[in-house]
Amino acid sequence: ALPVAVLGAGPVGLAAAAQLIERGIPFVIVEAAATVGANLLDYGHVRLFSPWRYDIDPAMARLLQPTGWQAPSADELPLAGEVVQRVLEPFAQLPQVASVLQLSTKVIAVTRQGFDKVKSAGRENAPFVIRAVRGGRTFELKARAVIDSTGTWNTPNPVGASGLPAIGEPELADRIFYGIPDVLGAHRSRYAGQRTLVVGAGHSAANALLALAELAGQAPGTRLLWSVRSPVLTRVFGGGDADALPARGALGSSLRSLRDSGGLTFQ
């Protein structure tokens, strides 16, 4: 039987693999990066607002337990990098995972065998064909089903409106950081004493703004500007003390206080 193809070896992809193992379903994992959890490592310095109890798939935990793996404290808030180090990497080393894990393999197309773009009758019964590139070599593999867990981290929303880059944005790419920079660590020199514009109203923006505010207290001349598309900030401010995840509520409350105190220029 053809395997299920899991695209992406992050927390979702590896959780899917764990579920497939417990159900006895053959699978293969295809990951573009050279390591599992690569997207989490991009913001490995950020503390998550979801505690460990929500960050580990139960099937993964069950498969890890016979190896002597120690589960983290359920109520502890991990750094993103710790999720990789303490869960994803040990899971990826299990023989039943390591034997089917293809790292440094970028998927460039997914289609159905024998069907082009204008044929549809019977398409749902045909195997999937996955075209990928590894080490400069292009190859194909077949699958009975595909689980796309690649995420959107590597395709960030551009600064401009309507899903388009702002005019001049591509030319200034070296001045723009998409994601959550390590403002107080590896990227400190880039932002200390500078005026920085943060665009967005999600939790990535909230983390960046609060880190920049802390940096401003340490490095004179550091200034913050915050720009959003919508004046409705309910999502990023969260539920405060009533938030189902207390750390998420605290993050939003801290950002609200920063804005209200005049610690940044809001527009």
Q: Which ranges hold each PLM region?
A:
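Glycine-rich active-site loop/strand segments that organize a redox cofactor
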Residues: 34-87, 181-185, 224-248
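A Rossmann-like FAD-binding core segment of flavoenzymes
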Residues: 109, 216-267
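Phosphate-coordination loops involved in phosphoryl transfer and adenosine-cofactor binding
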Residues: 1, 104, 193
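N-terminal Rossmann-like FAD-binding beta1-loop-alpha1 element of flavoenzymes
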Residues: 2-29, 198, 202-215
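Conserved Rossmann-like nucleotide-cofactor binding loop
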Residues: 12, 35, 153, 204, ...
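Conserved acidic residues
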Residues: 3, 144, 194
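Feature captures the FAD/FMN-dependent oxidoreductase FAD-binding
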Residues: 70-155
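Glycine-rich dinucleotide-binding loop and its adjacent helix/turn
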Residues: 148-218, 224
